[in-house]
Amino acid sequence: MKYIWQLANFPKFKYDTSKLLALVEESVILIGEIRGIMKGFSPVLQDEVSAQVMLSEAIKTSEIEGAYFSREDVMSSLMMNLGLIDYVLPSKNKNADAIAQLMIEVRKNYNQPLTLEMILHWHELLMRHHTDIQGGALRSSSEPMQVISGRYGDIQVHYEAPPSKDLTLLLENFFEWYKTFEDSTLGKIGEAIILSALSHLYFETLHPFEDGNGRIGRAITEKVLAEKLQSPLFISLSACIEKSKSTYYDEIKKAQRSLEVTDWLVYSIEVLIQGLKETVLVVQFVRKKTEFYDRYNNELNERQRKAINKMFNQGISGFEGGMTAKKYVSINKTTKSTATRDLQELVDKNIFVRMGGGRSTSYELNLV
């Protein structure tokens, strides 16, 4: 079976809009809900939501490719590059800095047309600390670019991309298709959603880089949505994709074998809906965090504030296992008796809720 780039009528994708209508309508409602809430937020709170979403996207788009970074490394780089803090100690992980800078760059230029120069710049940012990959350059090897799995002697080829010698023309065709794409069947937002999903598939099919295609492809998805909707979209698609990576790869593999892409669009819009729902949770979390500090900040000592900041920094996923006396001692470099006294005070003030008892005692923030 041929891959779609080998078909004479590529990239004339076909899909059944009747199977997308309900999903697009749900997406439109969620986008409207998020926009409405964000309009009521101050610029500071909007930046907080943006940072939380970019943090999730940076970490999860990397984890999909097998790269793991600490939340602290990525968050500190994001906050400094966004100008939300003046200075942080340099990150020990330069690749964490790189993915953070990519996230900011993608969103900063959301209203500019997608171009080859833009994508090459993203790739240069992403790969600038890799000595084995030339950042900002298309692949040039005469060897086939294949997506494979298995061990030596038992290799399975999942996909073979176009030869590198054809990439210049193929990318010209991609950007021309992108600029001229029209489908008003499902409205303006529906058109943006469809174009973003197809752009992701199209780019992944060309696979123009030696490495980083997945991360750039997912960045393109969010860039296209924001550009066509004419406003930044606060969403992390990779956080939803990462929950079931095998499904993601299976859907791409299937879509690269037929120009009938209804299933790919259904999958992509379902991921979008999940991402939008996650954003609603992030917005609610940021609001509760703000209300919490407005109410309790003056009642906290420095140790308590440091521990609570640590808990909030874990985002909507929460502080795994809750706060414990042992963790409190470690965070503050203090004694167990001081930790016990501080924690009890937080319970007495209804700031913490005690969970369990004895050695298994832990504490959760009371955000009700």
Where on the chain are the PLM-derived regions?
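FIC/Doc superfamily catalytic core
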Residues: M1-V368
